[in-house]
């Protein structure tokens, strides 16, 4: 095990609530069930830009996604991982309860059983893009939206009648992952996006693509599915997206899962639709001290699903079945580059690609 410094360079929240570079951020202590990773790459997610108001406290490290080399392994770790292994994972950045948690740092502490071992053939840039997205989408689909089907990529649907699932926002990074996972689970994904991205989403496995701006979008989906659509995953979660999802679901109702809190007023318009939303970091099992409706006690159920899902993802990764979203990678990156990338995402200047930074 490498000797770890007490302090490190990281992106931490300043007194004004913005992220800035700190050269004396704390390095997390090695806990029994954790590993410590020397960061080789990070990626930027939209959630990373939403922590500046009431979420993190000054000194907390930001960021979720990381990839790097294991430098320390906790005494209680049972997963086969060792110093020198290449791994990727996601942590809870911007954590008021644990300021040393966060991926935008030289060293990252992560739960061993919710990390993935990267094959040598997978570059750092690709590896860091596979964490938050694929964990969150797995939870959304197989823990919240489709539990009644009891399907996963390792146990796909085997029925004679195809089952269609709507992915609203298929050209996002979570959307392309959802389309792939649904296809691997033996289901039939259809999606919404801009017409310029129709070819993109179909290349990931979407059976049909619909223009979300079309005034007949929901009606077109409903007609194509013969009013039998039962499942909708909302990767955008706006008032318009939930309205289209609800209107597209069949006359008998169904299930709707969002990736953010949804509009209760719209959800109340159809009592036959069971609505919920997913919060990927619950899979870490930690108490979440963020404002409502995000804050909540740690969930053993979500933690158990996270560990089980990590094993599922590891198998997909090793078999080459996880295709990343289109990436814009910066090699030889600095923390200043990451700050610039966060600004781009916050200003809505990134579309159809994911920003990753390799150090």
From Swiss-Prot:
Disulfide bonds: none annotated. This is Trans-enoyl reductase mpsG. Monomer. The keyword Oxidoreductase applies. It comes from Macrophomina phaseolina (strain MS6). It holds the Pfam family ADH_N. PANTHER family: HYPOTHETICAL OXIDOREDUCTASE (EUROFUNG) (PTHR45348), TRANS-ENOYL REDUCTASE STHE (PTHR45348:SF1). It comes from the Eukaryota. The gene is mpsG. One of its GO terms (molecular function) is nucleotide binding.
């Amino acid at each position: 095990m490498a000797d770890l410094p007490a302090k490190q360079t990281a992106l931490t929240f300043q007194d004004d609530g913005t992220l800035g570079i700190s050269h004396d951020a704390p390095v997390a202590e090695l806990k029994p069930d954790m590993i410590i990773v020397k960061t080789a790459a990070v990626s930027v997610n939209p959630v990373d830009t939403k922590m500046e108001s009431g979420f993190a406290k000054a000194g907390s490290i930001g960021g979720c996604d990381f990839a790097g080399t294991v430098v320390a392994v906790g005494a209680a770790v049972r997963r086969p991982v060792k110093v020198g292994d290449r791994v990727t994972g996601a942590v809870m950045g911007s954590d008021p309860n644990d300021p040393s948690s966060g991926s935008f740092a030289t060293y990252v502490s992560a739960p061993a059983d919710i990390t993935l071992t990267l094959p040598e053939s997978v570059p750092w840039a690709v590896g860091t893009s596979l964490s938050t997205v694929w964990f969150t989408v797995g939870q959304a689909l197989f823990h919240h939206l489709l539990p009644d089907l009891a399907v996963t990529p390792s146990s796909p649907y085997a029925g004679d009648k195809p089952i269609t699932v709507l992915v609203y926002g298929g050209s996002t990074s979570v959307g392309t992952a959802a389309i792939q996972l649904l296809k691997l689970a033996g289901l039939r994904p259809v999606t919404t996006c801009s017409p310029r991205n129709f070819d993109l989403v179909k290349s990931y496995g979407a059976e049909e693509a619909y223009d979300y701006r079309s005034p007949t979008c929901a009606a077109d989906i409903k007609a194509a599915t013969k009013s039998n659509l039962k499942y909708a995953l909302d990767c955008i979660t706006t008032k318009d997206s939930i309205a289209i999802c609800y209107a597209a679901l069949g006359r008998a109702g169904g299930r709707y899962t969002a990736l953010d809190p949804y509009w209760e007023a719209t959800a109340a318009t159809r009592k036959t639709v069971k609505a919920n939303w997913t919060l990927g970091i619950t899979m870490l099992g930690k108490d979440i001290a963020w404002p409502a409706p995000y804050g909540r006690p740690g969930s053993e159920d979500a933690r158990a699903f996270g560990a089980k899902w990590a094993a599922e993802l590891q198998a997909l990764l090793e078999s080459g079945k996880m295709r990343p979203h289109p990436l814009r990678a910066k090699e030889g990156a600095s923390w200043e580059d990451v700050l610039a990338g966060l600004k781009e995402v916050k200003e809505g200047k990134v579309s159809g690609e994911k920003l990753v930074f390799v150090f």
